[in-house]
């Protein structure tokens, strides 16, 4: 899990629709790799696409120690500002925690710049892992927690998660106890970083009624990280009058890489057309 394939930021200058910019924001502990297929989809159709690597991401989870949620928002805001220099319209797509960052950008447009629409994918209002809810208290007792500590490595979705974060040519023996122990150790996340995620989550929930840009909210029915109730809660609380809720019946958490990705891409394409006018 130390080497992260395709973790680097990516930027594609548009052609046919070069003045329509799409900013993509990855998730907590993730990297631009999880959004690259969606980015390529729109780059191939002539749109300008930018996906920054958020601070303290792209390497092992231990590098997230000491992170502040403001760093993540400011990094995305910088990319938004740069897109605005050449694009007359900008759509922001956020995956998981990236959706929380997206909501902050949409809420603070006077500070960060105009946004013409947002796409929220698997955005966490309600987390499935109850340990995360104890982060603010537990961080004073222990320094980190392991999301894979109790994972069953025989389960396909667990193996899929591990392989996504491994080098492309990695061969992993999921029956080897020493290999599993090493994976669990490397996957441990600093609790102070989880606390920052929860702070950002709390702020986003509180400010949802003040977000009024057109919004597409997408959620996988088989999400093992974020409760599907999150999508419904966002849809009901967000201040946008132009809003859509897309359920993906065969998808888990990282929507651009899930079985329903073609349906997601088509929905975002249609939404882009609506925003473009």
Where are these regions (language model features)?
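Short beta-strand/loop motif that positions the catalytic acidic residue
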Residues: 211, 217-219, 223
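Catalytic nucleophile-loop/oxyanion-hole region of alpha/beta-hydrolase
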Residues: 60-91
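The serine-hydrolase catalytic nucleophile loop
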Residues: 29-39
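Catalytic active-site module of serine/aspartate enzymes centered on a nucleophile-bearing elbow/loop
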Residues: 244-277
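Conserved alpha/beta-hydrolase
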Residues: 42-61
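Alpha/beta-hydrolase-fold enzymes
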Residues: 97, 101-104, 108-187
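Active-site nucleophile elbow and catalytic-triad environment of alpha/beta-hydrolase enzymes
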Residues: 7, 190-207
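Conserved alpha/beta-hydrolase "acid-adjacent" motif
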Residues: 224-230
């Amino acid at each position: 899990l130390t080497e992260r394939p395709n973790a680097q930021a990516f930027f594609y200058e548009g052609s046919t629709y070069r003045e329509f910019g799409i900013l993509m924001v990855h998730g907590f502990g993730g990297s631009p790799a999880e959004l690259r297929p969606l980015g390529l989809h729109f780059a191939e159709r002539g749109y300008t696409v930018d996906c920054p690597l958020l601070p303290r991401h792209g390497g092992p989870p231990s590098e997230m120690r000491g992170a502040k949620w403001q760093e993540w928002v400011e990094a995305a805001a910088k990319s938004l500002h740069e897109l605005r220099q050449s694009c007359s319209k900008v759509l922001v797509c956020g995956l998981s925690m990236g959706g929380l960052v997206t909501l902050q950008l949409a809420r603070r447009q006077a500070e960060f710049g105009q946004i013409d629409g947002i796409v929220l994918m698997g955005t966490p209002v309600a987390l499935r892992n109850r340990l995360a809810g104890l982060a603010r208290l537990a961080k004073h007792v222990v320094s980190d927690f392991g999301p894979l500590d109790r994972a069953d490595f025989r389960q396909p979705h667990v193996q899929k998660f591990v392989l996504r974060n491994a080098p492309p040519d990695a061969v992993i023996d999921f029956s080897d106890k020493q290999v599993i122990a090493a994976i669990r150790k490397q996957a441990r996340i600093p609790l102070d970083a989880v606390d920052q995620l929860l702070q950002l989550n709390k702020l986003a929930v509180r400010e949802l009624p003040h977000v009024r840009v057109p919004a597409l909210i997408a959620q996988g029915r088989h999400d093992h990280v974020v409760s599907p109730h999150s999508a419904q809660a966002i849809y009901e609380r967000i201040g946008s009058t132009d809003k859509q809720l897309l359920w993906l019946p065969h998808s888990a958490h990282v929507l651009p890489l899930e079985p329903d990705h073609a349906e997601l891409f088509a929905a975002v394409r249609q939404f882009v057309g609506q925003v473009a006018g």
